[in-house]
Amino acid sequence: VKEDLLTFEGKPLFPERRAYTVAYELSPAERELYDLVTEYVRTEMGRAECISQAGDRKRGNNVGFALTVLQRRLASSPEAILRSLERRQRRLEDRLRELTRIQETASPAEKEQTDARFDAKLPSLSIHDYEDMDLETTDSERLQFETQVEYVVDRATAAQTIPELRAEIAILEDLIRVAYKVR
């Protein structure tokens, strides 16, 4: 988008972006973490796609977005993925406690509305929104967007039942253990 902007003279307004890939070797521990997080993302992406195809596109898109951001953080640094996994685990544990409390105390009608109520709080984000952040974005806009990104990344899940949520939390615990070894 911004690459297409021209000056009044018809010249590109911004210089051409050039990205270079730098090859480097992963240690065995880094490779294990990369493979495990990639498998987690791949599996959950499949579940997100099923959710979208079943008619809940917003939820499916949010889960897909959250997982894509996690995968990018994996490429960023071991510390970045560790912190992201820890935050995600904490938020999903909070959600599990809340769902368990509702299941124990709510009427049947309230129990049916539980999932919709949690998902309704998440803003809709896409990877295009994430990629479109540029240098012209103000610090305030960037902070607001990053806050929304963290909110979705930490909370969006394909789990649809309490046992599925427990299983995802257990996977995150395993990933965190491996990430600590890499750190």
Locations of regions flagged by a protein language model:
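Amphipathic heptad-repeat alpha-helical coiled-coil/stalk segments that mediate oligomerization
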Residues: 103-151
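Short, functional N-terminal and low-complexity linear motifs
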Residues: 1-6, 50-55, 137-140, 155-163
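Generic N-terminal initiation segments characterized by hydrophobic and/or small/turn-forming residues
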Residues: 67, 93, 119-122, 132, ...
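Inter-lobe coupling linker of SF2 helicases/translocases
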Residues: 1-122
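Low-complexity, intrinsically disordered/propeptide-like segments
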Residues: 8, 125-128, 175
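Amphipathic alpha-helical coiled-coil segments with heptad-repeat character
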Residues: 31, 60, 71, 82, ...
